[in-house]
């Protein structure tokens, strides 16, 4: 049977696009994929970012509120409509709590209460946490996308990782949506196919205050992997500015709240 895997992109809650995320969760409830995987940066943790260090943002005291927003905006609504497997991958933004403790309060290292799975209640929501790239499908690794250099072209960062690792790669981090691939053949016979698949983002662009003039070559969306035995077919899903998107010939998406 054909397995359908939904791959969610960077949300960076609380800087997520509320309408887009609600639309994707609504789609998941109707589509009922076999598995859900997220490429990382589900939360942002700006209070403990190195960019915030020593500024007013570090002293806001709203870290718990941001953690609660993750549950309220994503995990709780998702679990109301979907009971299947959910997997999260480590990422640079989700590394921030560990990095902050390691560099500012090393005496607290190893305290599970300060680790991301505890901060965001992964056990309560049935979320499996991965600290390394992992095999999501035959011949495919899921990674965050910050494990190598960045490409300006959508799919290029993932393909570079694929060349380095010898697997096809699906990742996030770049906020770009697209596929690059290279196939090899000899004597008219395909000997290897390798894909680099980047799944876009679910951020609210206006929340990225660090962008000059609000400009970025980013694409909102997510991904689907269709798995049939050892054959994997990647499919990017573009989210239009009005929040709608098309999967398998059917339009999904919710109007603005």
Language-model features: locations:
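Conserved beta-sheet core of the metallophosphoesterase superfamily
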Residues: 139-237, 242
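Core catalytic region of metal-dependent phosphoesterases/phosphodiesterases
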Residues: 8, 13-123
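Short acidic low-complexity segments
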Residues: 119-138
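Beta-strand-turn-beta hairpins that frame and shape the catalytic cleft
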Residues: 1-6, 134-141
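Polar, enzyme-active/binding microenvironments
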Residues: 2-7, 30-31, 237-255
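Hydrophobic "anchor" residues on beta-strands that sit immediately upstream
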Residues: 6-8, 37, 87, 140, ...
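Acidic carboxylate-rich catalytic motifs and surrounding loops in phosphoryl-/glycosyl-chemistry enzymes
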Residues: 85-93, 128-132, 235-239
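Short coil/turn segments at beta-strand junctions that form active-site/ligand-binding loops
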Residues: 3, 32-34, 83-85, 138, ...
């Amino acid at each position: 049977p054909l397995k359908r895997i939904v791959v969610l992109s960077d949300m960076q809650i609380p800087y997520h696009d509320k309408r887009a995320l609600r639309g994707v969760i609504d789609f998941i409830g109707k589509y009922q994929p076999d598995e859900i995987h997220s490429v990382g940066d589900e939360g942002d943790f700006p209070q403990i970012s190195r960019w915030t260090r020593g500024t007013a943002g570090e002293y806001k005291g709203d870290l718990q509120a941001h953690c609660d927003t993750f549950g309220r905006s994503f995990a709780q609504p998702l679990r109301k409509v979907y009971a299947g497997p959910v997997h999260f991958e480590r990422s640079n933004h989700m590394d921030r709590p560990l990095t902050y403790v390691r560099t500012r309060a090393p005496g607290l290292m190893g305290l599970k209460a300060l680790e991301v799975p505890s901060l965001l209640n992964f056990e309560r929501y049935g979320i499996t946490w991965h600290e390394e790239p992992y095999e999501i499908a035959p011949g495919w690794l899921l990674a965050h996308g910050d494990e190598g250099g960045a490409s300006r072209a959508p799919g290029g960062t993932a393909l570079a990782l694929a060349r380095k690792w010898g697997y096809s790669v699906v990742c996030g981090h770049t906020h770009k949506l697209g596929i690059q691939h290279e196939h090899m053949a000899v004597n008219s016979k395909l000997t290897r196919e390798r894909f680099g698949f980047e799944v876009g983002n679910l951020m609210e662009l206006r929340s990225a205050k660090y962008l000059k003039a609000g400009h970025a070559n980013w694409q909102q969306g997510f991904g689907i992997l269709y798995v049939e035995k050892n054959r994997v077919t990647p499919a990017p899903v573009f989210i239009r500015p009005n929040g709608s998107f098309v999967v398998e010939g059917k339009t999904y998406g919710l109007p603005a709240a």
